[in-house]
Amino acid sequence: MKVTKQTFATFTRKKVPLANTIHHSSFIYNQFKKFNLCKSYSNRVINHLMSILISIFISGYDGKNTDFAKNSSCHRTTIAHFLNSGKWDDPLLADTLKRSVIEIIYSEAARTGKPVFCIVDDTIASKTKPSSRALHPIEDAYFHQSHLKGKQDYGHQAVSVMLSCNGIVLNYAFVLYNKAISKIDIVQDIAKELPTPPVQSYFLCDCWYVSEKIINTFAVQGFHTIGALKTNRLLYPSGMKKKLSELAAELSVTHKNFDLVTVKGRNYYVYRYEGNLNGIENAIVLFSYPEKAFGKPKALRAFLCMDVSLSTNEILDNYVCRWPIEVFFRQCKDKLALDSYQIRSAQGIRRYWLIMSFAHYMCVVETGEVCPFETGYHKISDIIQMEKYLTLYQCARECNDFDSFVKVVA
């Protein structure tokens, strides 16, 4: 979208008071219209959502209520109340966003014949541990094991479910884990929401989500599971129970049982097992070593695939498509303030994450073409900045002197 004086003139014809145009974005307003939100939400709700979204695309943003207030005619406490306890239908935005993600990804699969990937993982939004005397500590924050940091990390744990096809990657759900329901059950519930994809499709996950319950639920929805596997899982070669790591040690005495395969320019020795696991029948398990670390126990990686028709290379190539969710987490922390927001209530946090997901969606698909998040983020930032320049220009033309101009735009 190119912002011009003509598009600005169209915007000003909407009877938005001149003093409020500095806190308005016609680009973001048009996104609300596409989602039919303007018919369901009051002007108050639309204005609060717009203030938060504008803030996200302004340089220096770190998720604080003061950031929102800078782009709103309301006090920061008013916006905090809107997130934490305001009465508005946030499930409407969540459901509308989910339907749009499904439509885009499934349409791409039907058009190209390429698989839909449902990708699941979790991350920690790190927070400072409050004093034991804190009167109002952040809700639903706990210590979680951070595999990235290799230690316990205090904060909110988010379970993300993304849908991907042919390079288009969109966030479908971003769920706050609060120990009232297991992460396995969270993912299982989301899986049940998904319509059957139009082509052969796959659920991609790390070893924490490879469970019989999840595998079976996704199978019913039309997704085969491809996931990492812990090396202590039990296999049944020739009907005998054996740990995966023990079997790998026996097989890796010689290279003859392994094939050398190349994935993304890197070489691996891979052994292909087909058979049963505990609670899982007739699956493929790949034992993998980097070419230069063959036979080393700490270098062993294992992968499960429930589609036995796939070749070894196809399994590994598909599993690599799980990586965008890691990139998504980094983008949320670097650009969307996932690690730095200051919101206390669980409801406010869930609502902020929903708005954050909407911002990510806009960056990927709403700038005139499907593009990487970073590209879309900078495009929208430029659009909003140009809109502000045009607003200031219009205000200056309407004011008789500098003092009246300051009163309007301050």
Where are the predicted features?
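Active-site-proximal, Lys/Arg-enriched surface segment
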Residues: 85-166, 266-274
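Gly/serine-rich nucleotide phosphate-binding loop at the start of the catalytic core
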Residues: 1-93, 97-98
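Long, contiguous hydrophobic alpha-helical segments, chiefly transmembrane helices and signal peptides
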Residues: 79-82, 119, 158, 208, ...
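Short N-terminal helix-initiation segments at or just after the protein's N-terminus
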Residues: 51-66, 99-106, 143-151, 245-251, ...
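A residue-level signal for conserved active-site and pocket-lining positions in enzyme catalytic cores
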Residues: 68, 161, 358
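Generic structural signal for well-ordered alpha-helical scaffold segments
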Residues: 54, 102-106, 162, 188-195
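Single, function-defining residue in the core of a domain
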Residues: 2-36, 45, 49, 113, ...
